[in-house]
Amino acid sequence: MSEDAVKNAILIAGPTASGKSALAIRMAKATGGFIVNTDSMQVYGVLDLLTARPSRADLAEAEHFLYGHVPPSSTYSTGKWFEDVEALLGRCELQGRVPIFVGGTGLYFRALLGGLSQMPEVSAQVRDHWRGRMEAEGAKALHAVLCVRDPAIAAALQPSDSQRIVRALEVLESTGKSLLEWQKVKGRALVDDQSAQKIVLRPDRAWLGERIARRFSAMWAEGAIDEVRALLALDLDPALPAMKAIGVREVSAFLAETMSREEAIERSVIATRQYAKRQSTWFRNQLGEDWRVYASGEEVFQGGSFRDPQ
């Protein structure tokens, strides 16, 4: 553990719609801390509603950082997020205050506590080669190439995961080593594992499913259609992460009059529930036993479970 890792941080993980943001605000008020986005989709601009970013009222209640600061035309990696967090934690005006990391991206939490893998530089020539092939041949074809050249990492990737497939091929060609080998070489952690309060929300599945349905209906009523219309006006590459946000494809189909309002909402709700299930499974299998599990944010404050790190 790095000596300059931040001590007494609060980490709040959990599936989408589980109440993480409300809990983070309550903790920020209790500690005088500040909230740091730990969700890979909430970094992108334009999609305030569809990515469930904090509302204006939320922002007025506590300081929030790293939300909506990336244009949807960009690709934002775990490494870039790590760099942004490192810079944020070094700001003088935030020294001595409790950082509260909240979100649903497990790899971000892993990087915070365990350090980031030291990734090699890839030449522009190699990068252009593989990205050109991806555009020409598609993810499935390049996944087949990866199966032959690096079967171990190919087995860990979905055949549709174009971004990670290209990255694995780039690294293999540039270094002669599998991306899996590079991922074993860790840098310094940003947060001290021992002193951090680590919380994971695991609400009742039926309750979460209903909450997801209500929330998406509210998103639709509050302007999700306008968000997607604004995103489509940018004429972005469909392969960009922001274009893959849940709800974008469904609302786009509604705008193109190829899907009814009811079907667009229903499909978005189903996709969100499936995503929440994948998140819950990841947190259950990947987080250590020192993460405390709660059914709700309210439960965290009951019975003296929460301790003010100040």
UniProtKB/Swiss-Prot annotation:
Name of the protein this chain belongs to: tRNA dimethylallyltransferase
Binding site for substrate: T16, A17, S18, G19, K20, S21
EC category name: transferase
Catalytic activity: adenosine(37) in tRNA + dimethylallyl diphosphate = N(6)-dimethylallyladenosine(37) in tRNA + diphosphate
Positions bound to ATP: G14, P15, T16, A17, S18, G19, K20, S21
GO molecular function: ATP binding; tRNA dimethylallyltransferase activity
Assembly description: Monomer.
Disulfide-bonded cysteines: none
One example of a Gene Ontology biological process annotation: tRNA modification
The protein's role, per its UniProt record: Catalyzes the transfer of a dimethylallyl group onto the adenine at position 37 in tRNAs that read codons beginning with uridine, leading to the formation of N6-(dimethylallyl)adenosine (i(6)A).
